[in-house]
Amino acid sequence: YPLRRQRQMCIRDRARNYGFGINGDAFEQWALKLPLRAVDHHRDDLFQVEAIFMGQAGLLELNTIPERYQKDALNDGYFARLRNEYLYLSHKFSLQPMDYKLWRFLRLRPQNFPHIRISQLANLYYNRRAGLSQLLEATTVKEAKKVLSTSVTEYWETHYTFGSTSIRNEKHLSPFSLNLLIINTVVPILFAYGRHRGEEKYCDRAFDFLEELKAENNHIVRMWQQCGLEVENAGDSQALIQLKKEYCDKKECLRCRIGYEYLKR
């Protein structure tokens, strides 16, 4: 693929997985709205990067802030500064934001609010760790976690949304979140890149990462465990999740070797 296409795909896939399920679709739409050329012009200024990231997410309009926080958001200054910067940059590059109504907040832990995840992604981009080359250079799980590790800008250490203050917290990605990002982002990218380029070392590395990481702990994996299956690592859990979604849920028992053997009894 052309380099620009590779970058766009890498950022799209990474962004989608920053939604951790609930906001996955919204983050993908956001990534598709992200003008990489425009951001590249200002990548040495973290404030401007965050302004474009937040603005393209549709989060810099006053009506996106809960009414009880609007006055404080205007008074603390950061929201207004970001918004003014985005208005300038959006005019300069003819930017159009996504529909903010795509974001979901209900039953979402504050740590997973779009503002927090977008600030973390802005930090990654600013620190030159959002591209494909950095992921390809990570030869171990430890190195991959170092590439993915990020925190928020200073304002978000004491906020979860504009105008709503909280106890100071640097809001690093948790070990659990890092594992999920490696499983759902790094591994597929390594495997696809290896297949496309005919370089098996990347495919092998993807499998090595899955074998090293702990199995996911979700309702699908627990269901299989209750059936007596041993799930030793992330490779096992990914296989069982795929089995459930592509065969069980679609009633494809006759195409499934396990289902076929079960039905023969």
Feature map (PLM): residue ranges:
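Residue-level detector of well-ordered alpha-helical segments, enriched
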Residues: 6, 182-185, 252
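Single conserved hydrophobic/aromatic residue that forms the stacking wall/gate
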Residues: 1-11
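Charged/polar positions within long, soluble alpha-helices
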Residues: 191, 195, 258-261
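Conserved phosphate-interacting/catalytic interface
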Residues: 17-193, 201-227, 231, 235
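Acidic, carboxylate-rich catalytic segments that either coordinate divalent cations
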Residues: 226-265
